[in-house]
Curated annotation (Swiss-Prot), chains A, B:
Keywords: Glycolysis, Isomerase
Span list, region Disordered: 160-179
Name of the protein this chain belongs to: 2,3-bisphosphoglycerate-independent phosphoglycerate mutase
GO molecular function: metal ion binding; phosphoglycerate mutase activity
Domain of life according to the entry: Archaea
UniProt similarity note: Belongs to the BPG-independent phosphoglycerate mutase family. A-PGAM subfamily.
Signal peptide location: none
Enzyme superclass (EC): isomerase
Species this protein is from: Methanosphaera stadtmanae (strain ATCC 43021 / DSM 3091 / JCM 11832 / MCB-3)
Function (record text): Catalyzes the interconversion of 2-phosphoglycerate and 3-phosphoglycerate.
Catalysed reactions listed for this entry: (2R)-2-phosphoglycerate = (2R)-3-phosphoglycerate
Annotated EC: 5.4.2.12
Biological or metabolic pathway of the protein: Carbohydrate degradation; glycolysis; pyruvate from D-glyceraldehyde 3-phosphate: step 3/5
Length: 409, 409
């Protein structure tokens, strides 16, 4: 018996006039999921608590049974782990942009002309040449203009502000301590030095000279944000006795799984958008389940969230239909406890995460099948699970997998 | 106004093919409970939390308003209290079996031929002759081959393993400390000595000589298990200002009530099984309610749980129908707040407790009557209570009894 949490990222929504006052999920044609709903049990779920807007990171941590208020201080550690940086508890990690600054350090392009190549060479210089007292610097490029920075050493703190000014036309923000500790002051100072040194090291780098010659914005400064301390996390397998794996499109979700000690599977062609190679996503999910190497599989597909952020009503609906196609295989598997959910709602009207609960269903043997027959936010609210929380999910799955012990006698 | 929690132990279940995909409760003819559901309010309940499989002990502690994660370390203390051993906070208590060992101390019968008489005489020897340093030994026989052991003294711990090997053909397990404390080492040593001495004291006891002559297995060794420390518990009446009583079939449930400082009522003819004297159970429940001596009554009938453990589909269904007969009198009482529930599900397909929520209903004056008309797991999930927790029950009952104060102004 395998347990699966299948997260359709950001799927939850609100009624949309253009869809006849249906949500994208309600309006989508989803025969596979409807069939599983008909034969399963449904409900709504507050991933963290009612009205709280979860991030994808805090939502997934919660679904894996960790307390996000305890282990989550920022996105950096999970982004870093997601691109295979070997982070350690206590490391301070950041997401970064390669950006373009002019000679006065005014940021003229936060994404450095959406640079697609050469950042590995820039990263090499950063790793070799940045000098920050006794603090070890680990920098790695990610997709496009993105990268991660990890600071390792004694006396560091994550209680500091961001360097990224968020809007062009400004200098990098001076990083400031958020509390009175020496550690916060020291770390803020270190990050400010890092930003300055990045400009000095990158501005005349051959990669950038060539970009300027080609009329492209140079990637001549690095702007850290999303600071967080890498948490002490009890590995998933130690907590539950289940060998776990994560099949996901984005580094953030894979990073969460990595920090939880789970294996991760990369999906060639996955973009995390509605343009993702859905056939490849499909193949890697099904292959992982069928490999029989794992007791527990966390799946995440990201396009519905992206469409929600973009306010793309029909794109979101159509992507949900693509995901339903993936589900056809799972519908016919007998030896799984499948929990299908979103991590949060990303209403196309809000263009960001909201605190609306998400619709969930379970496919498993032995359920108290309810009389809900289609998958939708409002249909699910009438289901036999009523209203649950994200912290309940792994308890419910493990109970249905029959791998839990009685508490008491 | 009297408050009553009526627990039909282990009643919750899952759909069963042999019952036309109904649960035993859904399939049972329950006119009295259906009538109260029609005139009352229904819901589902997670006694501890969703997906957690409660023991009957931890479930009842929760229903009485105690935190099982705080007060529950094992079943022993409640079994001891249930047969009127006067336990004190700090005592270390065990359930025990009288068993049969051969001359090499191999256990050949864990239940000593299901001995029915003479264990009181064996217990007398144990109480008088066992010598365990400065530790006081209190041993008492219970039904059949069962007994309880209480250790009282300084420097004791419940962080030790069991002596019972669980399967015949093995020697008693050497009891081991579960942590590094001196207390755990000392207590493990004490229990190992107790087991050895029990064999020396009982092997040639006249009761056993006679059993051997009659071709019966002798009860010549005592195997403790289910160790727990007797908790400090604020008495029920002090917590709630309600004089409470428990009418139950089994020692475990009465023991929980006793440790909570409640009175208990013994029911002649009660077996805790589906063969119980249901008329006697009925009489003692109704007499206790009508005595007007108590503000709060905890009722437990145990047969549905036993049938669940046995996988006895029709036995479970038929027993629920018997319980419904008991309910006819309660249906017509006006001055009660009656909360009917199971403590946990014991699906006949699982043959053990599961984490499935249990169906509940309340009969009381002034309720927001919902439109559910029959008592069943899936019908209840559509009720006006939605999904509640075991910790909510006494709050709801006391509110409906109108004995609680506003919090604030």
């Amino acid at each position: 018996m395998k347990g699966i949490i299948f997260v359709i990222d950001g799927m939850g929504d609100r009624p949309v006039k253009e869809l006849g006052d249906k949500t994208p999920l309600e309006n989508a044609r989803t025969p596979a999921m409807d069939k599983m709903v008909e034969e399963g049990i449904t409900g709504i779920m507050d991933t963290i608590r009612p009205g709280v807007r979860p991030g994808s990171d805090t939502a997934h941590l919660t679904l894996l049974g960790y307390d996000p208020y305890e282990v989550y201080t920022g996105r950096g550690p999970f982004e870093a782990a997601g691109i295979n940086v070997e982070v350690k508890p206590g490391d301070i990690a950041f997401r970064c942009n390669f950006s373009t600054a002019d000679e006065n350090l005014i940021i003229t392009d936060r994404r450095a002309g959406r640079i697609q190549s050469g950042t590995d060479k820039l990263a090499e210089v950063i790793n070799n040449e940045v000098k920050l007292d006794d603090v070890e610097v680990i920098f790695k490029e990610s997709d496009g203009h993105r990268g991660v920075l990890v600071l390792r050493g004694n006396g560091l703190s994550d209680k500091i502000t961001d360097a990224d000014p968020k809007h062009e036309g400004n200098k990098p923000k001076t990083v400031k301590p958020l509390d009175d500790s020496e550690e916060a002051k020291f770390t803020a100072d270190i990050v400010n030095k890092f930003v300055e040194q990045s400009y000095e090291l990158l501005k005349d780098h051959p990669v950038n000279i060539e970009r300027i010659e080609n009329g492209e914005n140079p990637a001549n400064i690095i702007l850290p944000r999303g600071v967080g301390a890498v948490p002490h996390v009890t590995p998933f397998e130690e907590l539950y006795g289940l060998k776990g794996v994560c099949v996901a499109e984005t580094g953030l979700i894979k990073g969460i799984a990595k920090i939880a000690g789970m294996d991760t599977i990369d999906i060639p062609g996955a973009t995390g958008g509605i343009d993702t190679d859905i056939d490849s996503v499909h193949k890697y999910i099904v292959d992982t389940i069928k490999s029989n190497k794992y007791d527990f599989i966390l799946v995440n597909v990201d396009g519905a969230d992206e469409a929600g952020h973009d306010g793309d009503i029909f794109g979101k609906r159509d992507f949900i239909e693509k995901v339903d196609n993936i589900m056809a295989d799972l519908k016919d598997m007998d030896d799984i406890v499948l929990f299908v959910t979103a991590d949060h709602s990303t209403p196309v009207s809000v263009k960001d995460h909201s605190g609306d609960p998400v619709p969930v269903f379970i496919k498993a043997p032995g359920l108290r099948v309810d009389d809900v027959k289609e998958y939708g936010e409002r249909a699910a609210a009438k289901g036999g699970l009523c209203r649950i929380r994200g912290t309940d999910v792994l308890y419910i799955i493990r109970d249905l997998m029959n791998v839990t012990q009685k508490f008491g006698a």
